[in-house]
């Protein structure tokens, strides 16, 4: 028994030296939007780097929670697109606010509840004003505040692959874009 205990101790103490080294994630592709060093805070108050979205394809857009016209249509179009694509499990839905002054964690949580967003797939997020501007520029979303607190803004849905490359873009809001849905199906079908 002494020999077995000594043998077991030597294996336990030297085993880590022979273990396979942990592999670092592959570098991001040069055209990945995750190259941007921004931080997002979600509707549950969790803060993470923008690049933490890596690993799962995403439909991404920008909005603001107090919008009563176009932004609900953006959210509904994202929902409808996911449904039309067969509700793939390997697909995240991310809407980032460009009104960080008002769209805090509580406002985003209330918005998610009011719009019945399934938080298994959905993330509503806000960032610092500087990160919001950088993210909007990167995604090609234009916005400007109006004196009454509303915003003029463009409306776009982007499909990102797991590494953050833009695979498809759609400006069709209020109904599904067949080409965009096809791109979602193709990308989500390619995932393990």
Tell what function each PLM region has.
Residues 1-4:
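Positively charged n-region of N-terminal signal peptides that target proteins for export
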Residues 146-192:
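Thiol-/selenol-based redox modules, centered on thioredoxin-like
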Residues 28, 111, 115, 121-125, ...:
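Soluble extramembrane regions of membrane proteins in the secretory/endomembrane system
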Residues 38-58, 82:
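A short beta-strand-turn-helix
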Residues 6-16:
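Bacterial N-terminal signal peptides
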Residues 18-36:
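N-proximal helix/coil linker or "cap" segments that precede and/or mark the start of modular domains
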Residues 73-135:
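Structural microenvironment flanking redox-active thiols in thiol-disulfide oxidoreductases
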Residues 50-78:
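Short active-site neighborhood of thiol/selenol oxidoreductases, capturing the structured segment around
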């Amino acid at each position: 028994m002494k020999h077995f205990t000594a043998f077991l101790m030597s294996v336990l103490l030297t085993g880590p030296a022979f273990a396979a080294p942990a592999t670092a994630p592959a570098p991001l592709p040069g055209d990945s939007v995750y190259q941007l060093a921004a931080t997002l805070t979600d509707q549950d108050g969790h803060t993470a780097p923008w690049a933490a979205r890596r690993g799962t394809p995403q439909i991404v857009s920008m909005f603001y929670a107090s919008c009563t016209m176009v932004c609900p249509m953006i959210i509904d179009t994202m929902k409808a697109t996911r449904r039309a694509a067969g509700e793939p499990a390997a697909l995240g839905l991310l809407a980032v606010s460009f009104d960080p002054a008002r769209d805090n964690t509580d406002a985003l949580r209330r918005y998610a509840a009011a719009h019945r967003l399934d938080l298994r797939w959905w993330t509503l997020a806000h960032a610092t004003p500087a990160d919001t501007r950088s993210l909007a520029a990167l995604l090609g979303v234009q916005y400007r505040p109006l004196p009454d607190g509303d915003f003029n803004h463009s409306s776009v849905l982007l499909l990102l692959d797991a590494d953050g490359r833009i695979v498809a873009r759609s400006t069709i809001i209020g109904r599904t874009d067949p080409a965009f849905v096809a791109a979602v199906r193709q990308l989500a079908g390619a995932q393990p």
